[in-house]
A protein has these predicted regions:
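Bacterial Sec-dependent N-terminal signal peptides
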Residues: 1-56
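Cell-envelope and extracellular/periplasmic
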Residues: 54-512
Length: 512
């Protein structure tokens, strides 16, 4: 019997199904081939990465970096344990050689020349011959800029972080930011409660208007002034995080030795809601993630703007700040690491006592190689982040220029030195008081009318004081205090100092 001819293969439905099946088989074959090719590519890339990772450098030692001039600058990285590492530089014939330790880490100190640009550093493996070249290296002046939000505050208004409202005249300042001999590094914000990290996110970039407007306003303006005054390359290492306590910036081992830190450890212990809401405020959190990774990078000095977050327990600030400075100097391997810090700007809700605690460290000589600039006259009663960043940056620069570079500029405002009583008046003598004057509300230089000035008798009841500058000294009195015994200036939470010297620098707050 003859079977009927099967017409199914010729039916449109069957033909479509057959084609789809063949297409599916074809696609699967192509997929497997592509998958295998991708696997091989990934394997090749992994091998390449592994090979290149035999010499690993921290983010701060990279293209566009700036090395401190005329010193022994520290370089470091990682390789295989026991591996020989060689370093060559474009400015010298010497080959620096060292061996990695058991953990694979190595470090060397390279002698740097006077300021120059367009240099390179080559790091080579003695085992594999692999060489990593760091290009466009500058040799000049390197400064750290660290602290909390007023140091972090960017030049341009920020859409996401709305507290960054932008500095005054930011467009004009950004337009004057095209400086190929200023390079900027920013440690990306991070924290860690448990692990002390050895690297961080960040890169060196050449200063331009686009870069500068998204960088710390104070740090950039400080760098620009140094560059113009010194005519040398300048590098800034920005390490700042808003809302952080001083304790966030100190090593855990240091704080565990002193009971003064018990309160903050108790307040930020694991499991507490505050640690989830404000993880960056925890003790050592910023040290672990942001400071330790750049530890030892050779710098000329540090400018520091922080204390707002410590203001509500101001009585502890002086010893904590002393611990911070001493530990940074010791850990950095730079015993004379200059620290120039800002006396924080007045703000309506910020306890003014913290400014006096800051002043104790400097005025009482509790640390060497430090200096305090002040923002006592540029605060904002409604905003803890004043828009005037030109003035603080300039005052930081004056300290650096005067103390580190020998420039004959005044860096210090009038500083109370002596108080005497003459009848119903107190006579105040100041250091750094050449050309002492009062700036009135109309912006005129006058000899009377100091703001936020008070006197008291032995009863301690302070009354607003009248004042007059006579012979370079400030005479102070009040009709309500016939026998004055105490005097204070600019100690309120919000105030605006108006007593200046000829350099335009304001007098520091005081209580006597």
């Amino acid at each position: 019997m003859i079977e009927p001819f099967d017409l199914r293969p010729f039916s449109p439905f069957f033909m479509l199904k057959f084609c789809l099946k063949r297409q599916k088989s074809y696609l699967r074959t192509k997929y497997l081939k592509m998958k295998r090719a991708c696997f091989l590519l990934v394997a090749m890339l992994a091998t390449a990465i592994q090979l290149s990772a035999e010499i690993t450098l921290p983010s701060i030692i990279s293209d566009n970096m700036v090395l401190q001039q005329k010193t022994d600058a520290k370089l470091w990285g990682w390789g295989e344990p026991g591996e020989k590492i060689e370093i060559r530089t474009s400015w010298g014939k010497k080959v620096y050689s060292t061996l990695t330790n058991a953990d694979g880490k190595w470090s060397v100190y390279v002698k740097t020349p006077g300021h120059c640009s367009g240099q390179w550093v080559k790091v080579s493996s003695g085992r594999t011959g692999e060489t990593v070249e760091i290009s466009n290296v500058l040799v000049g002046e390197v400064w750290m800029a660290s602290g909390q939000s007023n140091m972090e505050f960017e030049m341009m208004p920020h859409k996401k972080d709305t507290w960054m409202t932008g500095m005054y005249n930011w467009e004009e300042e950004a337009a004057d930011a095209g400086y190929p001999d200023i390079h900027l590094f920013k440690v990306e914000e991070d924290w860690d409660h448990n692990v002390v990290r050895d690297n961080c996110k960040g890169e060196w970039v050449v200063c331009s208007p686009e870069v500068a407007k998204r960088y710390s306003a104070i740090a950039f303006l400080f760098a620009r002034e140094l560059h113009k005054e010194l005519r040398r390359p300048v590098g800034i290492v920005l390490c700042a995080f808003g809302g952080t306590h001083a304790e966030s910036w100190i090593r855990d081992e240091v704080m565990r030795r002193d009971s003064i830190y018990n309160r903050v450890y108790k307040g930020y212990s694991p499991g507490m809601p505050v640690i989830d809401k404000y993880p960056h405020k925890a003790p050592a959190a910023i040290w672990n993630a942001m400071v330790n990774p750049i530890l030892g990078y050779t710098v000329k000095g540090n400018i520091w703007y922080q204390a707002e977050s410590n203001a509500w327990r101001a009585e502890d600030y002086a010893p904590i700040f002393i611990d911070l400075v001493n530990d940074w100097r010791s850990s950095w391997g730079q015993k004379r690491l200059p620290f120039y810090f800002m006396q924080v700007a007045p703000y309506g809700e910020l306890p003014g006592a913290v400014r006096l605690e800051q002043a104790k460290v400097w005025e009482n000589g509790l640390l060497k190689d430090i200096g305090m600039a002040t923002a006592i006259d540029v605060g904002d009663s409604l905003d803890i982040h004043p828009k005037n960043k030109v003035v603080p940056a300039h005052r930081f620069a004056l300290w650096a220029l005067a103390k580190e570079y020998g420039k004959k500029v005044e860096c210090c405002g009038p500083l109370l030195e002596k108080v005497s009583v003459e009848g119903n008046r107190m006579v105040l003598s100041f250091g750094h008081s050449k050309g002492l004057y009062v700036l009135n509300a109309a912006g005129e230089k006058v000899s009377a009318g100091v703001n936020y000035l008070y006197v008291a008798g032995t009863d301690g009841n302070f009354h607003p004081a009248l004042s007059e500058i006579i012979g370079g000294k400030l005479h102070v009195w009040s009709p309500d205090v016939p026998a004055p015994a105490q005097v204070k200036y600019c100690t309120e939470d919000y105030c605006k100092g108006n007593l200046y010297n000829a350099a335009g620098l304001p007098a520091y707050p005081f209580v006597h």
